[in-house]
Amino acid sequence: MPIQARIPRTLLLADAAWRLGPGALARYGWHRLALASGQAARRLAGAAVPGGAFLADLPLSPAPPLLQAWQARLRAALAALPPARHHGPFDPMAPALGMDLFRPGDVRPVWEAGRLACLPRLAQAALLWPEAGHRAALEARLTAWCAANPPFQGPHWACGQEAALRALHLALALALLGQDHAPASGARDFLALHARRIGATTHYAQAQDNNHSISEPAGLFACGLLLRDAALRDHGARALSAALARLVAPDGGFAQVSTGYHRLLLDVLAIVEWLRRRHGAPAFPAPFAERAAAAARWLAGLVAPDGVLPRLGHQDGSAFADLALAGPDDARGSIERAMRLFAGASAGFPEEPGCDWLALPAAPAFTPPDFWRAAGSMGWRRDGARALLRTGPLRFRPGQADLLHFELWDGATPVLTDAGTGAYNPAPADRWWLEYFSSAAAHNTITFDGREPMPRAGRFLHARWPRLTALPDGAALRDANGHRHARRVSAEGRLWRVRDEVGGGFSTLALRWRLGPGEWRATPNGAAGPACISIAADAPLTLRLEEGWESPAYGQVRRCTLLVASAAASLRWIETEIGLG
């Protein structure tokens, strides 16, 4: 690459680094130094494959009473387990630290299989049908996985967070089987190896200021708890509470403004809290309880009656510790579990089978507020509809250029939606996903002169973050190009209004509304279909329906419909009315 081409990218990286702050940069620097010096690798030297039994031959407790439909779901899940040996295009014998996790292909599906979500499922099956051989299948699965993945080699050992989630799944499975207080030797060796792996790259986890910073100390806590290592347990507890204090605001907003990663946050917190109570361990240091409850209430206010969440922010399809077997598209089990544990309330899903497995008592119903504001977002509820606005402040790096993005749901029906994620490392023919799904054009907001408000500086990194300010009924931003955009939201019954006021030196602008599923047709003032949308402005507008793209699930992309309003520089405001049926 010629030096002239490198200069702009270097400037973008410098800008992004300045915004991340000295603390994150210092921690990442320590991580790189530990890798380069061999210190991290030395911490992982001399490891052997677990050789003893993973499960003890102990009597099984009866399973909770469960509907036949749920039991059929478990049978289907067991029939679709991934193979124990699954490395995708990655070398299973390569040293895990420093592996190239991008050039060979997308590591995300490989890691999903390596989280061993099958362990709690096999434990559930063993309790439901004790004569069907599922306990032996769980033992065989762990033996086969360890043989296929020697310690600290291959993609499944490349990430501390993945090691933590895998250890948590084993801890949960052992607890369901009643074997977590005195694990068998193979399970103890397995947990000890995972604690070593997590501990080898803690500076990296802390530098991320995202779910890594939560999951990895949670994994250390669980390993210490089951290994009866009080020092490791307490270290994990302190680090987890410190991360929660930094990354979850008192209002429940998470540093990663993403419904998918917020769900993963709650799932991880719920499992370690349940394990802590089960073992009678000391409470997590403050402000763990307060922040966990606030985070649970934030997501409870967004879930649809069928468990679907808005696709706000990055979505990787995680459904961690999914005892309800609901999958990534149904978050009811995650939210109900977290609400009962942390808020002492129900999210409105009292017949939740995952809570039955954990023997969580029923709780009074939680009523979400009609209006709320949290770090990074604000929302409204009116007459069965829910709205969400992506706001500031930008204390942590934004994953997508989704500022002032607005979503609207009518019950379980999405009316205005987010485009989703695509994939983190798609196939060469689909590389356009990386730019498209993270762009402002993939969100319900305004772009000026066809330019992005934040240039991308890396796969998960943007530079030149806009300045955001809060408004009583919305938020406003000013980007690095001098463009100004203020968005205000109001509702009267079933009629919603979004008023956009703009300024700055622009020649053209485009307002995009990404329409939910259904038959939409153009009208003189907008579009009609599952809702009636009309757009007005103080200057002439060009309105059209056009085809776009959305990602309903990780790795999946399909066509969708957009309503686009275009205008010239003389425009100062646009008002959109959405009438719900």
Locate the predicted segments by residue.
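Extended, charge-enriched "interface" segments that sit outside catalytic cores
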Residues: 29-101, 108-113
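CBM-like, beta-strand-rich accessory domains located in the C-terminal region of large
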Residues: 164, 322-324, 328-333, 421-581
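Residues that flank catalytic or metal-binding motifs in active/ligand-binding sites
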Residues: 114, 216, 376, 404, ...
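Aromatic-lined, polymer-binding surfaces characteristic
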Residues: 94-292
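Short coil/turn segments at secondary-structure boundaries
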Residues: 29, 157-159, 208-213, 308-316
